[in-house]
Structures are given as C-alpha cells and as structure tokens.
Amino acid sequence: MEIWNAYTADGQLTDHTLTRGESIPDGLYHLVVECIIRHRDGSTLFMKRDNTKLSYPDYYEATAGGSALFGEIAEQAILREVREETGIELTADQLRHHTHFVAHDDQCIFHCYWAETDWDKSTIQLQADETSNYIWVPQENLKYFLETELVIPRQKDYVERLFLEQEQGKSENETQYNMR
C-alpha cells in the first residue's frame, strides 16, 4: 500500500494522508515529481513505456518520476524515482528545478526537474512491466526524434522548451538516431 502526504492546491502540507488507488477528497492534492535526464555529452534519455501500460503504451517518456511517498520532499522523491526507474544515482546538487504546476483534474502538484549526469549510458536499467527500452538521443537529432516518435505530449513540450528553443535559427541535422 502506497501512502502519500496530502497538500492544498497552493502546496501547503496538511495533516491528511492519501492512499494510492483511493479517491482523493476535494481540495487535496498529492505531490508528483518528474526529471529529464541529460548526459554530459548533450544527449537526452528517453524510456519506452511497456506495451501493457494503460496510458501511453509504447510511447517514449522524457522523464523518470512518480508520486512522492509519505514523508518525502520533492527532491528526495525524484532521486528515488530516477534510481528506481533508470538505475542512475543522482545527487541533489545535480537537480535543476524546471517548473511546477497544479493539475486540478488529477489532483496533483507536479514538480519538474532536469539533471545532467556522466552516468555510463550503457547501464540503464529497465523496470519490469514499466519500460521496455531506452534511447539516448543526441542533441542534433532531438528535434527529428520528437517529430517522428511517439512521446508523451506534455513531456515533449518540456524537452522542446528546455533544449530546443536555444537551437532555433540553427540548421537541423535530421540523421537517424541509434537505438541502444
């Protein structure tokens, strides 16, 4: 059973707890964290969702992440989620806070990060029933990858804002990217 802290929409911690799978009372929210992983060489990690996933099966995820567990703050939760979902061990000083927003329909408060690492790219771990593959997409192929592959739309927007807006005006190299 997964237990979460409950927050108000403005991010204030309450005395309530929430349980995954149970309805969330009106006016309460749970904390969700996501992190885009960037390698020091400029490539971005995408994890392919398992084809048995209910939402976005066989789509690429640009982030590792999930719900913060009871007692965790956002930074603790994202370090744990990245380790569980990819095997990458990040430190808090590698995290760069990108944005946060409230998804009222889902009763979630999202904290979104990105991090740069020099982790061995060949040692990414897949999570059974969660992910089926991964790919490191070089910066010069990122625009093409986002245009031609199934990527979760909201995460695609993050990647574009973070790593492609700086590229506007430059010529794009649309060579094929290499699967692992």
What are the roles of these predicted feature ranges?
Residues 1-34, 40:
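Acidic, metal-coordinating catalytic segment for phosphate/diphosphate chemistry
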Residues 89-98:
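A short coil-to-beta-strand element that immediately follows conserved catalytic motifs
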Residues 10, 39-42, 50, 116-121, ...:
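Short loop segments at secondary-structure junctions
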Residues 22-32, 40-80, 84:
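Conserved Nudix-box catalytic region and its N-terminal flanking loop in Nudix hydrolases
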Residues 21, 58, 70, 97-99, ...:
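Nudix hydrolase/Nudix homology domain
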Residues 16, 47, 98-100:
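Residue-level detector of high-confidence beta-strand sites
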Residues 35, 64, 113-115:
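A structural signal for short, well-ordered beta-strand segments
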Residues 3, 9, 14, 20, ...:
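Glycine-rich, flexible loop/turn motifs
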